[in-house]
Swiss-Prot record:
Similarity comment: Belongs to the chaperonin (HSP60) family.
Keyword Translocase: no
SUPFAM superfamilies, per the entry: GroEL apical domain-like (SSF52029), GroEL equatorial domain-like (SSF48592), GroEL-intermediate domain like (SSF54849)
Purpose: Probably plays an essential role in the productive folding of PrmA, and thus in the formation of the active PrmABCD complex.
Pfam families: Cpn60_TCP1
Protein name: Probable chaperonin-like protein PrmG
Signal peptide: none
Any one GO MF annotation of this record: ATP binding
Annotated Gene3D superfamilies: GroEL, GroEL-like equatorial domain, TCP-1-like chaperonin intermediate domain
């Protein structure tokens, strides 16, 4: 198919138009008094949200060059959400400001590659400055304040999340579930989590959340590669007779065996999910043995002498519930013998004391935390499905922000830490166009604070000017409209979220600034037309393919 091209200033201007379209839709949600966006759904009621990444996912522009710019900024939100689960609106606002200032400099004659290097060096200095400012969580009150702020100042959500995170600690796991009852509740249950998800999206039970959730499943644990139908059929028959879902934790499942399991899910004849077994190399069998003790099953391996063809229900583990996402698996309520589990934990602790290599020590610490970790389940209810979805998004954002704060500490919030971090750039010795790149970052750092103030009904430029002259850590509280110490006022942000937002924004902005050519598929003015001389379009009135844009 023919391509359409744009070059130099024209290409960058069209890309910037898309950047602005997406960012303008997202930035009105920033801050404690940010507004909502209403998103149309092809099926069901519309979604009302102030979650940046949720809004960004829905945006697709008609003009293809502008759409490329919008998709690049969408990547900023997606990347930030993937790393820390929050800060997507801040990242989008920063990206828009950096793109605007950077393109203005390039159009004025600056060398884009040198501008890019200046941006990268400036961001590195700002991140180091933020790290120095960061302080550790002071207690449950700090947890509650972070969660409350991330949930658009909802104290009910803040209290529930702080209670859950404080209970499970750093090694525990907190998950969210929809509830039929109004309000929020927190349930504490024993659970195990590891960082491997399903190997096929066709196995999800909740397409909207892209999760596979099974209650009381049978769990096959093996370090073998399963490719043939005869390898997996005995386990399927056991699960079918018991009328229970089948979860397969294996080194690899592929070929006809995987096709059989996927087909069973698609035709709803057999519920199953396949997850790559945790661990690598020689550690995989050891981690599978940990799970076998917790779940009450056996590891099917060459060393144990049990073959896949010999499997019975006694060889399979089980649990109360298992939740599998694209990247994580959470097991709740393992049906293993508690005495054997305690003995296994004691054995691992003994191995940890004797371990001399740092990698072995870290691996054993992870395995111990996995077996002793607790899971807190936050159940979210709403009066309508629209309210439920909106509240779920806020709970998930607040939870991600709180866990990030526990992990890496906190900085002054409300855009203050970023707005005041320009002071660290004063000692950065850059010349020429690299100095211009540094100025791009310096001007962009105040943009989140400006929009937090604007959304709260204040003059953004005036607020930025005042905060720039305040002592470090003192800023603008958009909720009260007053200036003061952000930590004393409880206006704080996780350092990890702030860092991820800045780095993601700078990455995409640097790429856009150095763009000279944009290439898209040629847009058909009348797709599906059959033009005949003297007759016009012979396909007029017929169903025709829609334009890809």
């Amino acid at each position: 198919m023919a391509k359409e091209l744009r070059y130099n200033t024209d290409a960058r201007a069209r890309l910037e138009h898309g950047v602005n379209a997406l960012a303008d839709a997202v930035k009105v949600t920033l801050g404690p008094k940010g507004r909502n966006a209403v998103l149309e759904k092809l099926t069901g009621p519309p979604t009302i949200t102030n979650d940046g990444v949720t809004i960004a996912r829905e945006i697709q522009l008609r003009e293809p060059f502008a759409n490329m710019g919008a998709q690049l900024v969408k990547e900023v939100a997606m990347k930030t959400n993937g790393v820390v689960g929050d800060g997507t609106t801040t990242a989008t606002v920063l990206a828009q400001a950096m793109v605007r200032e950077g393109l203005r400099s390039v159009d004025a004659g600056a060398n884009p590659m040198r501008v890019r290097r200046g941006i990268e060096r400036a961001v590195s200095v700002v991140v180091d400055s933020l790290h120095e400012q960061a302080s550790q969580i002071g207690g449950q009150s700090d947890l509650q304040r972070i969660a409350t702020l991330a949930a658009s100042d909802d104290e009910v959500i803040g209290h529930a999340i702080s209670k859950a995170v404080d209970y499970v600690g750093k090694s525990g796991v907190v998950t969210t579930e929809e509830s039929d009852t109004l309000g929020l509740s927190v349930d504490i249950v024993d659970g195990i989590e590891f960082d491997h998800g399903y190997i096929s999206g066709y196995m999800v039970t909740d397409p909207e959340r892209m999760e596979a959730v099974h209650t009381n499943p049978l769990i096959l644990l093996t370090n073998k590669k399963i490719t043939q139908v005869q390898d997996i059929m005995p386990s399927i028959e056991v699960a079918k007779r018991a009328d229970r879902p089948l979860v397969v934790l294996a080194e690899e499942v592929d070929g006809p065996a995987l096709q059989l399991l996927v087909g069973g899910n698609m035709h709803k004849t057999m519920q199953s999910v396949v997850v790559r077994a945790p661990g690598f190399g020689h550690r995989r069998v050891a981690e599978l043995e940990d799970l076998a003790v917790a779940l009450g099953g056996h590891v099917i391996a060459k060393d144990t002498g049990i073959e896949l063809s010999e499997i019975s229900v006694e060889h399979l583990g089980s649990c109360d519930r298992i939740t599998v996402t694209e990247n994580e698996t959470t097991i709740v309520g393992g049906h293993g013998d508690q005495r054997l589990l305690d003995a296994r934990i004691a054995q691992l602790e003994s191995q940890h004391e004797r371990a001399k290599i740092e990698a072995d020590q870290e691996s054993l610490e992870l395995r111990i935390a996995r077996l002793t970790g607790r899971v807190a389940v936050i159940r979210v209810g709403g009066a309508t499905s629209v309210e439920l979805k909106e509240r779920m998004l806020r709970v998930e954002d607040a939870l991600a922000a709180t866990r990030a704060a526990v992990e890496a500490g906190i900085v002054s919030g409300g855009g203050t830490a970023l707005a005041q971090s320009h002071r660290a750039l004063a000692d950065l010795d850059l010349t020429g166009d690299e100095a211009i790149g540094c100025d791009v970052v310096r001007r962009a750092l105040a943009e989140p604070l400006r929009w937090i103030a604007i959304n709260a009904g204040f003059d953004g430029d005036e607020v930025v000017e005042v905060v720039a002259g305040l002592p470090l850590g003192h800023g603008f509280n958009a909720l009260t409209g007053e200036y003061g110490d952000m930590f004393d006022d409880g206006v704080i942000d996780p350092f990890k979220v702030t860092r991820a937002a800045l780095e993601s924004a700078a990455s995409i902005a640097a790429l856009l600034i150095t763009t000279e050519t944009a290439v898209v598929e040629e847009v058909l003015g009348n797709p599906g037309a059959i033009m005949a001389p003297g007759f016009g379009d012979l396909a007029e009135g017929m169903v025709r393919p829609s334009n890809i844009y």
